[in-house]
From Swiss-Prot:
Residues 132-348 are annotated as: Domain III, AAA+ region. This is Chromosomal replication initiator protein DnaA. GO terms for biological process: DNA replication initiation; regulation of DNA replication. Plays an essential role in the initiation and regulation of chromosomal replication. ATP-DnaA binds to the origin of replication (oriC) to initiate formation of the DNA replication initiation complex once per cell cycle. Binds the DnaA box (a 9 base pair repeat at the origin) and separates the double-stranded (ds)DNA. Forms a right-handed helical filament on oriC DNA; dsDNA binds to the exterior of the filament while single-stranded (ss)DNA is stabiized in the filament's interior. The gene is dnaA.
Length: 468
């Protein structure tokens, strides 16, 4: 009963939730129904708290729908569903024993032995594992926001249960959004939990260079042993494998060996796996075997939080209105924000002047002028029209077909996000529409970005194009 009831609930939740959310939070849950109590087992405290906070009402609604007045009590626990007691083995007769002992040795197959995370990997004497994990990048100095929330949650779960949570974990998004920080944070957390763990971080080009050197020095077997003996392999910018057939071939076999051994793989890219050109389909397919999560450009609140955190790290007081002023004007990525703040702080140190909005405007005048020149409502309209292969006139027209209305709503939302224009000004620029129409468009796109992978991708792509 517990399995069928929870299976029904899961099927409905899968229909209602975005695929990434369902895979990350609901799929790992196990259920047991006992004495009219349905216990849901979560793999760790983080998942338990998240599910209880975000999905409790939905689960209770479905239980009431399926059970009516006999709705079971709902409990949450960290752990796994208790295993059923094994059935007693049948009594073996002397004839059975004799038959087994007389069977040919090759037919007495051994079960494959898989490496578990708690096993101590045998050290390879002739290979010195170079971690390359940056100790400065930790989870506690990664600023969380809606744009990176799922990626951060997945990274934490992998760090808590490497090889067993999501394998591989594939993070993708534009430059400077925090993917590399998360890779290092996972590596640091794994080593903190298990100091003798072999964790290797590298850029994909380093993998290629190592393989070329191994081939030149007739040391390809050592190369294979090195990469296949790690506990966690963290590879940045996997898209640089494009058109490198020999490297892809070797990585394909390394990937398979690590997964078979329950060794963790985390990959990052600037685009969704299937969109990486020049990479074999069999590799792209494997990239999606675990969990694939988008890291999006930070929204305004996250940009402000990043600036405040970085200023605190520099022991600099940054007024809220100053942080908001910078964050409102620099939108593309975290790296750009940090660079701008470093420039402001350096100017303040050189001149001894307090950091005010006027001072920031002066210190960043060329950067701000470039940004304002690049992102205008006119530019947004042209970019969106080109992206969706429609005319700018369509965006300004009264047409309501979805092929026009959705791009129009996206363009309005982008204008609100990327410019300093008011809602009435944006509405006026879109064929004289009312400000309430613009507000509705912004809210609709925000909702669709949560529900639709395609809309989320389109929005991120347009942000990157307009901010680059």
């Amino acid at each position: 009963m517990s399995s069928s009831l929870w299976l029904q609930c899961m099927q409905r939740l899968q229909e209602e939730l975005p695929a990434t959310e369902f895979s990350m939070w609901v799929r790992p849950l196990q259920a047991e129904l006992n004495d009219n109590t349905l216990t849901l087992f979560a793999p760790n405290r983080f998942v338990l708290d998240w599910v209880r906070d975000k999905y409790l009402n939905s689960i209770n609604r479905l239980l009431q729908e399926y059970c009516g007045h006999d709705i079971p009590n709902l409990r949450f626990e960290v752990g796994s569903r208790p295993m059923a007691a094994p059935k007693p083995a049948p009594t073996r007769t002397p004839a059975d024993v004799a038959a087994e002992s007389s069977a040919p040795a090759q037919l007495q197959a051994r079960k494959p032995v898989h490496k578990t995370w708690d096993d101590d990997a045998q050290a390879i004497a002739d290979i010195n594992h170079r971690s390359n994990v940056n100790p400065k990048h930790k989870f506690n100095n990664f600023v969380e926001g809606k744009s990176n929330q799922l990626g951060l949650a997945a990274a934490r779960q992998v760090a808590d249960n490497p090889g067993g949570a999501y394998n591989p974990l594939f993070l993708y998004g534009g430059t400077g959004l925090g993917k590399t920080h998360l890779l290092h944070a996972v590596g640091n957390a794994i080593v903190d939990n298990k100091p003798n763990a072999k964790v290797v971080y590298m850029h994909s080009e380093r993998f290629v260079q190592d393989m070329v050197k191994a081939l030149q020095n007739n040391a390809i077997e050592e190369f294979k042993r090195y990469y296949r003996s790690v506990d966690a392999l963290l590879i940045d910018d996997i898209q640089f494998f494009a058109n490198k057939e020999r490297s892809q071939e070797e990585f394909f076999h390394t990937f398979n060996a690590l997964l078979e051994g329950n060794q963790q793989i985390i990959l990052t890219s600037d685009r969704y796996p299937k969109e990486i050109s020049g990479v074999e389909d069999r590799l792209k397919s494997r990239f999606g075997w675990g969990l694939t999560v988008a890291i999006e450009p930070p929204e305004l609140e996250t940009r402000v939080a990043i600036l405040m955190k970085k200023a605190e790290d520099h022991q600099i007081h940054l007024a809220d209105e100053v942080a908001f002023f910078i964050a409102k004007r620099l939108r593309s990525n975290v790296r750009e924000l940090e660079g701008a703040l470093n420039r402001v702080i350096a100017n303040a140190n050189f001149t001894g002047r307090p950091i005010t909005i006027d001072f920031v405007r002066e210190a960043l005048r060329d950067l701000l002028a470039l940004q304002e020149k690049l992102v205008t409502i006119d530019n947004i309209q042209k970019t969106v029209a080109e992206y969706y292969k429609i005319k700018v006139a369509d965006l300004l027209s009264k047409r309501r077909s979805r092929s026009v209305a959705r791009p129009r709503q996206l363009a309005m939302a982008l204008a609100k996000e990327l410019t300093n224009h008011s809602l009435p000004e944006i509405g006026d620029a879109f064929g004289g529409r009312d400000h309430t129409t613009v507000l509705h468009a912004c809210r609709k796109i925000e909702q669709l970005r949560e529900e639709s992978h395609d809309i989320k991708e389109d929005y991120s792509n347009l942000i990157r194009t307009l901010s680059s």
